[in-house]
Swiss-Prot record:
It comes from the Bacteria. This is UPF0173 metal-dependent hydrolase Acid345_3437. It holds the Pfam family Lactamase_B_2. The keyword Heme does not apply. SMART domains: Lactamase_B. Keywords: Hydrolase. The keyword Lipid metabolism does not apply. Belongs to the UPF0173 family. GO terms for molecular function: hydrolase activity. InterPro entries: Metallo-B-lactamas, RibonucZ/Hydroxyglut_hydro, UPF0173, UPF0173_UPF0282_UlaG_hydrolase.
């Protein structure tokens, strides 16, 4: 598939850096320092213009506060999480909710549904972080990308296909905390992308799903397996 100047780098687990043809740097689910799958060369984030957070679990919100304070990106998240981030001193929080779209530079960001929990661990407490979500990103070059966040397959993925028609779907496959490869293949049937990037697998022993298993089930599109630190462009 031709990404038309878009660059997608997998930093391990559910963390991605996406660079648009105009040079906008997007960081999705910023967990790098404690992420055992993230290459050492990527643990120091050098630039980020837009940060997207799908939910409040440590392996997704991870380094959001530190990176946001250092680079001052626009931080897109659900309102309850935004309130928590602002209490931690994060500025430029761009709250939104499911179904909403906001334009950030050369990207149209739409927040969509995910089926997962969203508590934020804050010291010895778990703080309500709103609901988990996914994002649809439509770029100026007409490429559309869907990051599902942590989720199981759900029937409204068909709506995501019908309204936005993402060509690329980043789908969790690890099982236990998210869907497994078989469910991810069913999600692909609903979404009808051109390519799936499998994520959220292998980081911990309990995340047993494998891209090779996904390939056995998927019939509607390619499975674009990436290695942590690899860039698809």
């Amino acid at each position: 598939m031709d990404l038309q100047g878009l660059k997608i780098t997998w930093l391990g687990h559910a963390t991605f850096r996406v660079v648009t043809p105009k040079g906008t740097h997007i960081l999705i689910d910023p967990w790098v320092m404690g992420n055992p799958a993230c290459p050492e060369t990527e643990k120091q984030v050098k630039k980020v213009d837009v940060m997207l957070i799908t939910h409040g679990h440590f392996d997704h919100i991870g380094d959001a506060v530190e990176i946001a304070k250092k680079h001052s990106p626009k931080v897109v998240c659900i309102p309850e999480m935004g309130a928590w981030l602002q209490k931690k001193g994060v500025k430029n929080v761009a709250e939104m909710n499911k179904g909403g779209t906001q334009h950030v530079g050369d990207i149209a960001v739409t927040m969509v549904h995910a089926v997962h929990s969203c508590g934020i661990t804050d010291g010895d407490q778990v703080v309500y972080g709103g609901e988990a979500c996914g994002y649809v990103l439509k770029f100026d070059n007409d490429v559309t990308l869907y990051h599902a966040g942590d989720t199981m397959a759900f029937s409204d993925m068909k709506i995501i296909h019908e309204l936005w028609r993402p060509q690329i779907a980043m789908l969790p496959i690890g099982d236990h905390y998210t869907m497994d490869p078989r469910q991810a293949a069913y999600a692909a049937e609903l979404l009808q992308p051109k390519a799936i990037i499998p994520m959220h697998f292998g980081t911990f022993p309990v995340l047993t799903g494998k891209p090779s298993e996904l390939e056995k089930f998927v019939e509607v599109c390619d499975v674009h397996e990436m290695k942590p630190g690899e860039t698809w462009s």
